């Protein structure tokens, strides 16, 4: 299967190439924007909605009144009366059985959406460009494995078909009947309440036939399941991208295919059938960035890569690491050496001062000993002790103190103490 080519072959009703070629319209090279297609499809689909609303009286067709406070029940309005289960039940609220809904729907909701004309055209261009890529068409689920070429163009004679058997024969010759078989196999019953609303059966989408003039082609193809027919002048994004997804399998007639350049123009020429419309362009012609960056034109303008390796440096504390401190402050070495010298000098001064004080104390003790007339005797450990001075005994502690004999108590004398009169001599 051929991808998008500058020339597209035109196939006859026998499924063979007729020998004619058609230039590929520029719209098939337009940028594919699935986001724009989805946005436009979502908003245009809302224009088919029918307004609906609930009755304004729904949920309020009963007499109910709140009981107020003091009864240990909720203050929701309650049905009045007695003699039935309904009396005393809650009413009106959206949380009550038989009550109204929250925010009852109204018919004056904003049902429709306006979409910019240029944006709608952009979406159609993207959908047409995607229909020419086999990968996107196959990802959409179409069976096009045996189709000879994409986009598929047939002669204008097909527009004059009036019989369905002619249309079926054409699809079989073009190897497109496999897509119709897929539609037949997908026919099933709808799930949900749509069965009760005249939407019982559902099926997949088949090919989209795009023509220029209706000379009976609609009657020939309309009864084949899955087929969609579109006029090239009235392309619809809802049909070209069902569900908002690009990649619809399209079969073109020759005249409709040639008319695309007049409808959407090219990048050199504006559209002749639309006023002031230019075909959207790509931001990049070539999206292969690796090929662009490796091209000689780009490489010639680039500088040589720098091979400098930036290694992570372990941060060290300069207050604890002298080498790092010297990098930050070379004068730190001098400051530290001056500190060491100052400390040594101060230490020497303290030692000298202590020695001088000891010498002065020794001289003073010598003077006292000379005054007493006793020569000082050098004792143990270099201590000077005066001669004739008894050494004080240490107090006894413990068992030794208990073992020593206690001195005998003095006996009381029997002699009477003289009175004051006897002591005093007579005058």
Curated annotation (Swiss-Prot):
The modification Citrulline is found at residue 300. Gene3D superfamilies: 3.40.1370.10. It comes from the Eukaryota. The modification Omega-N-methylarginine is found at residue 97. The modification N6-acetyllysine is found at residues 14, 106, 259, 333, 353, 364. Pfam families: Ribos_L4_asso_C (PF14374), Ribosomal_L4 (PF00573). GO terms for biological process: translation. Its main location: cytoplasm. One of its GO terms (cellular component) is ribonucleoprotein complex. The modification Phosphothreonine is found at residue 266. InterPro entries: Ribos_uL4_C_dom, Ribosomal_uL4, Ribosomal_uL4_dom_sf, Ribosomal_uL4_euk/arc_CS, Ribosomal_uL4_euk/arch. Citrullinated by PADI4. There is a cross-link at residues 239, 327 (Glycyl lysine isopeptide (Lys-Gly) (interchain with G-Cter in SUMO2)). Residues 377-397 have a biased composition (Basic residues). Component of the large ribosomal subunit. May bind IPO9 with low affinity. Interacts with RBM3. This is Large ribosomal subunit protein uL4. It comes from Macaca fascicularis (Crab-eating macaque).
């Amino acid at each position: 299967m051929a991808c998008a080519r500058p020339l597209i072959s035109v196939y006859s009703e026998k499924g063979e190439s007729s020998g004619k070629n058609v230039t590929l319209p520029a719209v098939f090279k337009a940028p594919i924007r699935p986001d724009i297609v989805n946005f436009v499809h979502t908003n245009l689909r809302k224009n088919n909605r029918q307004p609906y609303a609930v009755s304004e009286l729904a949920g309020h067709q009963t007499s109910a009144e709140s009981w107020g406070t003091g009864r240990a029940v909720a203050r929701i309005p309650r049905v009045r009366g007695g003699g039935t289960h309904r009396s005393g039940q809650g009413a009106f609220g959206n949380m009550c059985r038989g009550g109204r809904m929250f925010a009852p729907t109204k018919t004056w909701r904003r049902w429709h959406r306006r979409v910019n004309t240029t944006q709608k055209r952009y979406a159609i261009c993207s959908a047409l460009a995607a229909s020419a890529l086999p990968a996107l068409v196959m990802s959409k689920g179409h069976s096009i494995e045996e189709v000879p070429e994409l986009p598929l163009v047939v002669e204008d004679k097909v527009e004059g078909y009036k019989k369905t058997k002619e249309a079926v024969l054409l699809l079989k010759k073009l190897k497109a009947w496999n897509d119709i078989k897929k539609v037949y196999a997908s026919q099933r019953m709808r799930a949900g309440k749509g069965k009760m609303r005249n939407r019982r059966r559902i099926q997949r989408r088949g090919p989209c036939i795009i023509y220029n003039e209706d000379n009976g082609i609609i009657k020939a193809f309309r009864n084949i399941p899955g087929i969609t027919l579109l006029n090239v002048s009235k392309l619809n994004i809802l049909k070209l991208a069902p569900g908002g997804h690009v990649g619809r399998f399209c079969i073109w007639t020759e005249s409709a295919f040639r008319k695309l350049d007049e409808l959407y123009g090219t990048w050199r020429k504006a559209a002749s059938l639309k006023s002031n419309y230019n075909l959207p362009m790509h931001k990049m012609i070539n999206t292969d960035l690796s090929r662009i960056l490796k091209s000689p034109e780009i490489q010639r303008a680039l500088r040589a890569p720098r091979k400098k390796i930036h290694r992570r440096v372990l941060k060290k504390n300069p207050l604890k690491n002298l080498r790092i401190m010297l990098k930050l402050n070379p004068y730190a070495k001098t400051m530290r050496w001056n500190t060491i010298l100052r400390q040594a000098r101060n230490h020497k001064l303290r030692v000298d001062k202590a020695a001088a004080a000891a010498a002065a104390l020794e001289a003073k003790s010598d003077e006292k000993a000379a005054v007493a007339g006793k020569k000082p005797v050098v004792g143990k450990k270099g201590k000077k002790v005066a001669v004739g001075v008894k050494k004080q005994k240490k107090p006894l502690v413990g068992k030794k103190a208990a073992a020593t004999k206690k001195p005998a108590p003095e006996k009381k004398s029997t002699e009477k103490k003289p009175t004051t009169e006897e002591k005093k001599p007579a005058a």
